[in-house]
C-alpha cells in the first residue's frame, strides 16, 4: 500500500496544485463572483432564448428553433452533446473542468493543463517536467485569448488533444488495453464537445503521427507491434465516434442544406458552390499570424484596438493637427493596432 501511495502521491499533489493555480489565476471569478464578458457565450445564450424558454415551460427539449436563420435544428446551438452511453465520459469531462462547467475560465485552464500533464505521463516524463509542460501549455497566449472571447468548445477540444495523443503513444508502446480504452474515451469526449473543425485537424495530426511512428517501427523491426497497435487505434476511434454518430449524421445532413454546401439558388443556369474561400478562412490565421502563439502582438495587436484611443499617441496628435474632424474620424479607422 505504501509503495502504491508513494508512486501516486506526486500526481495527486500536481492535480491539486493545478486546481489551486487555476482557481487563483481567475480569482475574481471564484472569490468575487465576477464574470468574464465572453462575447461568444453571450451570443450563444441569446440564440438559445427560445429553446430555454420552451424547455422551462414544457419540461422537455425542443428539436427546432425559429430564432436563427429562419429556422434550424436546435441541437446545433443547444444541448445534444451527450449520448446514451455517456456516464463515464461525462464524469471525466466534469472532473477535467473542476465541475465548474464548460464556460468557466477556471475549468478550461485546468482542463488544458491536466490534459497536457496526462500526455507527458504517457510519454514517461518525470512529473516535474510534466508539470512544467502543463503550465506552459495551459497558459498559452492563444488559450487565454480564446477563453476571454468565449470560444469554450474549441478550447475544450484542444485540451483533449494531448491526452488523445498520449493514449495513441501507449498503444504503440504495446500497452494495448490501456491505450485502447483511453483512445476511445478521449475521442468520444472530443466529438461530444461538438467542435468538429478541431477534431478534423486532429485527424491530420494523428495520420502524420501514425506514419512517422510506422516508419520508425518498421525500420527497428517492430512491424508486428505497429500493425496490432494501428488496428486497435482504428477500432478505438470507431468506438469513440459511434455513440456520437446520430449527432454527426444529422449535422452532415443539415450542412448540405446550408451555404456550407452547394447553394440551391441558380443563376444563369449555374449552381454556386457554397461560401467562397475568403469568407470561409476569414477568421483563420495566416502563416505569420500563427507566430502569435509564441510571440504576443507580433503583428501589432487586436484589430478592434486603435492607437488613437491613447490621447497622448502620435496618431492622435497627427489627427488633431488636421483641424478637420470629418477627415480625422475617417483616418482614425486606419490606426488599428493590427497590421497583419
Report each predicted region and the residues it spans:
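Membrane-interface coil-to-helix junctions
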Residues: 21-113, 135-158, 271-340
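Mature extracytoplasmic enzyme cores
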Residues: 12-18, 55, 79, 83-89, ...
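Start-transfer (signal-anchor) and selected internal transmembrane alpha helices
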Residues: 1-27, 224-237
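Membrane-interface starts of transmembrane alpha-helices
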Residues: 9, 13, 95-104, 126-133, ...
Amino acid at each position: 500500500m505504501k509503495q502504491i501511495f508513494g508512486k501516486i502521491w506526486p500526481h495527486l499533489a500536481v492535480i491539486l496544485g493545478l486546481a489551486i493555480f487555476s482557481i487563483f489565476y481567475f480569482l475574481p471569478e471564484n472569490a468575487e463572483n465576477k464574470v468574464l464578458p465572453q462575447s461568444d457565450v453571450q451570443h450563444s445564450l441569446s440564440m438559445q432564448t427560445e429553446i430555454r424558454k420552451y424547455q422551462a415551460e414544457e419540461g422537455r427539449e425542443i428539436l427546432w428553433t425559429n430564432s436563427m436563420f429562419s429556422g434550424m435544428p436546435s441541437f446545433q446551438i443547444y444541448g445534444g452533446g451527450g449520448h446514451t452511453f455517456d456516464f463515464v465520459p461525462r464524469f471525466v469531462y466534469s472532473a477535467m473542468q473542476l465541475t465548474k462547467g464548460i464556460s468557466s475560465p477556471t475549468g478550461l485552464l485546468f482542463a488544458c493543463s491536466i490534459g497536457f500533464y496526462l500526455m507527458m505521463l504517457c510519454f514517461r516524463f518525470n512529473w516535474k517536467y510534466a508539470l512544467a509542460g502543463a503550465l506552459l501549455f495551459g497558459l498559452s497566449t492563444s488559450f487565454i485569448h480564446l477563453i476571454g472571447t468565449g470560444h469554450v468548445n474549441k478550447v475544450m477540444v484542444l485540451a483533449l488533444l494531448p491526452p488523445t495523443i498520449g493514449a495513441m503513444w501507449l498503444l504503440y508502446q504495446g500497452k494495448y488495453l490501456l491505450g485502447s480504452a483511453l483512445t476511445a474515451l478521449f475521442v468520444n469526449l472530443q466529438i461530444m464537445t461538438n467542435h468538429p473543425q478541431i477534431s478534423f485537424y486532429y485527424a491530420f495530426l494523428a495520420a502524420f503521427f501514425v506514419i512517422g511512428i510506422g516508419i520508425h517501427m518498421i525500420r527497428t523491426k517492430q512491424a508486428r507491434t505497429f500493425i496490432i497497435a494501428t488496428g486497435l487505434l482504428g477500432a478505438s476511434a470507431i468506438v469513440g465516434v459511434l455513440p456520437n454518430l446520430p449527432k454527426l449524421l444529422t449535422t452532415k445532413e443539415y450542412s448540405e442544406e446550408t451555404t456550407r454546401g452547394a447553394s440551391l439558388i441558380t443563376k444563369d443556369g449555374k449552381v454556386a458552390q457554397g461560401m467562397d474561400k475568403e469568407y470561409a478562412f476569414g477568421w483563420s490565421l495566416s502563416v505569420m499570424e500563427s507566430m502569435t502563439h509564441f510571440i504576443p502582438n507580433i503583428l501589432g495587436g487586436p484589430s478592434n484596438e486603435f492607437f488613437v484611443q491613447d490621447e497622448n499617441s502620435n496618431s492622435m496628435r497627427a489627427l488633431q493637427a488636421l483641424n478637420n474632424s470629418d477627415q480625422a474620424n475617417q483616418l482614425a479607422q486606419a490606426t488599428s493596432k493590427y497590421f497583419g
